């Protein structure tokens, strides 16, 4: 292929191009005339082989043209660029193939009867073109994966806002579900805490979200549940009012703000907010739905803040005021006892050496085994004797415990009581007569 850079002015390009084409036409005409004036013995052939000879002569002319074009050089270096597809050029550009078809379809026949590029060469070039397309596609896909996600790309795949559901009604249902789960599972608030305990054997039903797409009904159920939760927090707060009024005042302000925020939902209970298959009908319904979504997101934060503040205040008052002195002393004694037991076990784990007296007794009376065993388990046996209730159940401790001397049986009467009964004094007043005294009538 002849490639030259176009560096001449625009005014001379057309003239130079016409001049080059004229030279090429003259040269081609001379070559064709030279082939026609050859020896007729070389050009004549039999009738049965006319098609093959015509194709051979044509292919010979084309091959000669191709060789001449390879040796052709223009006179002007500044001539415009010319490209000949299918020739042995330095840079081959992608072209349309007529002798290769995809998916096994038959190839089209050329009109000229001969081709500038052979069949295997065309197949090879087209395979290279297909491979180049695939490599370019994979490279572009890698570049797309490296690009950051933008809002426009999210809108193209149907995600709006901060990756929420596009349908406003479905977003509201997800918020209702999360609030019900938060109140029931995380905060432990359900119908079991709000129902009276008159029916002990009637198990409470788990408070779940209603199975309905009616937004107004869902909001009414949630408001009732949140109001009960607010009453429970108020009851817990009022029980600790006399302990610390400053902390009580802080929690009280928070609960009052929570109650005033909950009043905003009562205004949304007035409109019907109808929807058909999850789609709001009018613009007013869409506005109320968006406002309810914002309020529900804020309601979740109010619930968490109120529960956390009241729970911490109640826990602190329990530690400071509700635990009596006896409970505190018992807790301290248990800790001290556990520390002593752990220290005794650590000392028991340490290896002890045998003294000279113990060694003499073991050798003289052949008691080496028992003495060594006692030395190894000395600390453990000491802890066992000092605190048997730690290692044995109460029934075993009662059996093995020391018998109290001078125990008095309450069933047998004592001698002092018998003496008191014998020396009992006679009352000074006469006994009372229960008989009836007759009266005389006058």
From Swiss-Prot:
<feature type="compositionally biased region" description="Acidic residues">
    <location>
        <begin position="416"/>
        <end position="425"/>
    </location>
</feature>
<keyword id="KW-0217">Developmental protein</keyword>
<feature type="compositionally biased region" description="Basic residues">
    <location>
        <begin position="433"/>
        <end position="442"/>
    </location>
</feature>
<dbReference type="GO" id="GO:0045169">
    <property type="term" value="C:fusome"/>
</dbReference>
<comment type="function">
    <text>Regulatory component of a deubiquitinase complex consisting of bam and otu. The complex deubiquitinates K63-linked polyubiquitinated proteins, antagonizing the ubiquitination activity of Traf6 and regulating the IMD immune signaling pathway. Otu-bam deubiquitinase activity is regulated by Traf6 dependent immune signaling regulation of bam expression levels; this forms a feedback loop that regulates the IMD immune signaling pathway and balances gut immune activity during aging. The complex deubiquitinates and stabilizes CycA/cyclin-A to regulate CycA-dependent differentiation.</text>
</comment>
<dbReference type="GO" id="GO:0045880">
    <property type="term" value="P:positive regulation of smoothened signaling pathway"/>
</dbReference>
<dbReference type="GO" id="GO:0007282">
    <property type="term" value="P:cystoblast division"/>
</dbReference>
<keyword id="KW-0833">Ubl conjugation pathway</keyword>
<dbReference type="GO" id="GO:0061060">
    <property type="term" value="P:negative regulation of peptidoglycan recognition protein signaling pathway"/>
</dbReference>
<dbReference type="GO" id="GO:1903006">
    <property type="term" value="P:positive regulation of protein K63-linked deubiquitination"/>
</dbReference>
<keyword id="KW-0963">Cytoplasm</keyword>
<dbReference type="GO" id="GO:0042078">
    <property type="term" value="P:germ-line stem cell division"/>
</dbReference>
<protein>
    <recommendedName>
        <fullName>Protein bag of marbles</fullName>
    </recommendedName>
</protein>
<dbReference type="GO" id="GO:0043130">
    <property type="term" value="F:ubiquitin binding"/>
</dbReference>
<dbReference type="GO" id="GO:0005737">
    <property type="term" value="C:cytoplasm"/>
</dbReference>
<dbReference type="GO" id="GO:0048477">
    <property type="term" value="P:oogenesis"/>
</dbReference>
<dbReference type="GO" id="GO:1903003">
    <property type="term" value="P:positive regulation of protein deubiquitination"/>
</dbReference>
<keyword id="KW-0896">Oogenesis</keyword>
<dbReference type="GO" id="GO:0000900">
    <property type="term" value="F:mRNA regulatory element binding translation repressor activity"/>
</dbReference>
<dbReference type="GO" id="GO:0017148">
    <property type="term" value="P:negative regulation of translation"/>
</dbReference>
<keyword id="KW-0744">Spermatogenesis</keyword>
<dbReference type="GO" id="GO:0098730">
    <property type="term" value="P:male germline stem cell symmetric division"/>
</dbReference>
<dbReference type="GO" id="GO:0007276">
    <property type="term" value="P:gamete generation"/>
</dbReference>
<dbReference type="GO" id="GO:0045170">
    <property type="term" value="C:spectrosome"/>
</dbReference>
<dbReference type="GO" id="GO:0048132">
    <property type="term" value="P:female germ-line stem cell asymmetric division"/>
</dbReference>
<dbReference type="GO" id="GO:0007283">
    <property type="term" value="P:spermatogenesis"/>
</dbReference>
<dbReference type="GO" id="GO:0045478">
    <property type="term" value="P:fusome organization"/>
</dbReference>
<feature type="region of interest" description="Required for interaction with ubiquitin">
    <location>
        <begin position="201"/>
        <end position="250"/>
    </location>
</feature>
<dbReference type="GO" id="GO:0030718">
    <property type="term" value="P:germ-line stem cell population maintenance"/>
</dbReference>
<dbReference type="GO" id="GO:0007284">
    <property type="term" value="P:spermatogonial cell division"/>
</dbReference>
<comment type="subunit">
    <text>Interacts (via central region) with ubiquitin. Interacts (via C-terminus) with otu (via OTU domain); the interaction enhances otu aggregation into amyloid-like structures and enhances its deubiquitinase activity. Together with otu interacts with CycA/cyclin-A (via C-terminus); the interaction stabilizes CycA by promoting and enhancing otu dependent deubiquitination of CycA. Together with otu interacts with Traf6. Part of a complex composed of at least tut, bam and bgcn; complex formation does not require RNA.</text>
</comment>
<dbReference type="GO" id="GO:0030727">
    <property type="term" value="P:germarium-derived female germ-line cyst formation"/>
</dbReference>
<dbReference type="GO" id="GO:0003730">
    <property type="term" value="F:mRNA 3'-UTR binding"/>
</dbReference>
<keyword id="KW-0131">Cell cycle</keyword>
<dbReference type="GO" id="GO:0035212">
    <property type="term" value="P:cell competition in a multicellular organism"/>
</dbReference>
<feature type="region of interest" description="Disordered">
    <location>
        <begin position="408"/>
        <end position="442"/>
    </location>
</feature>
<keyword id="KW-0221">Differentiation</keyword>
<keyword id="KW-0832">Ubl conjugation</keyword>
<dbReference type="GO" id="GO:2000738">
    <property type="term" value="P:positive regulation of stem cell differentiation"/>
</dbReference>
């Amino acid at each position: 292929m002849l490639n030259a850079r176009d560096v001449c002015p625009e005014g001379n390009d057309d003239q130079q191009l016409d001049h080059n084409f004229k030279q090429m036409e003259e040269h081609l005409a001379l070559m064709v005339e030279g082939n026609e004036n050859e020896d007729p013995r070389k050009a004549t052939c039999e009738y049965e082989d006319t098609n093959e000879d015509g194709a051979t002569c044509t292919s010979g002319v084309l091959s000669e043209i191709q060789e001449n074009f390879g040796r052709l050089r223009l006179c002007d270096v500044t001539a415009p660029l010319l490209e000949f597809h299918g020739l042995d050029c330095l840079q081959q550009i992608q072209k349309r193939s007529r002798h290769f078809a995809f998916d096994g379809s038959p190839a089209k026949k050329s009109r000229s009867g001969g081709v500038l590029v052979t069949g295997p060469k065309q197949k090879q070039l087209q395979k290279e073109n297909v491979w180049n397309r695939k490599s370019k596609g994979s490279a572009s896909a890698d570049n797309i994966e490296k690009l950051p996600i933008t809002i426009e790309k999210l809108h193209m795949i149907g995600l709006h806002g901060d990756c929420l559901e596009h349908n406003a009604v479905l977003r509201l249902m997800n918020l209702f579900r999360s609030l019900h789960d938060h109140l029931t599972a995380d905060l432990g608030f359900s119908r079991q805490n709000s129902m009276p305990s008159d029916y002990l054997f009637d198990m409470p039903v788990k408070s779940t979200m209603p199975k309905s797409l009616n937004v107004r009904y869902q909001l009414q159920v949630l408001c009732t549940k949140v109001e009960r939760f607010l009453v429970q927090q108020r009851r817990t707060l009022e029980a600790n009012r006399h302990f610390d009024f400053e902390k009580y005042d802080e929690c009280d302000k928070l609960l009052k703000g929570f109650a005033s925020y909950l009043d905003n939902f009562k205004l949304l209970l007035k409109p019907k907010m109808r929807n058909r298959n999850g789609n709001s009908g009018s613009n007013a319904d869409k506005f109320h739905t968006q406002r309810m979504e914002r309020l529900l997101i804020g309601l979740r934060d109010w619930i968490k803040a109120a529960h956390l503040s009241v729970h911490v205040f109640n826990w602190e008052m329990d530690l400071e005021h509700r635990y009596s002195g006896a409970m505190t002393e018992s807790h301290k004694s248990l800790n001290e006892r556990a520390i002593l037991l752990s220290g005794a076990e650590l000392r028991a784990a340490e290896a002890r050496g045998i003294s000279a007296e113990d060694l003499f007794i073991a050798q003289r009376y052949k008691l080496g085994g028992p003495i060594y065993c006692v030395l190894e388990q000395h600390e453990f046996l000491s802890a066992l004797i000092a605190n048997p209730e730690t290692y044995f159940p109460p029934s075993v401790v009662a059996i093995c415990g020391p018998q109290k001397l001078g125990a008095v049986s309450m069933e047998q009467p004592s001698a002092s009581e018998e003496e008191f009964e014998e020396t009992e004094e006679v009352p000074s007043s006469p006994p009372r007569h229960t008989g009836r005294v007759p009266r005389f009538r006058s």
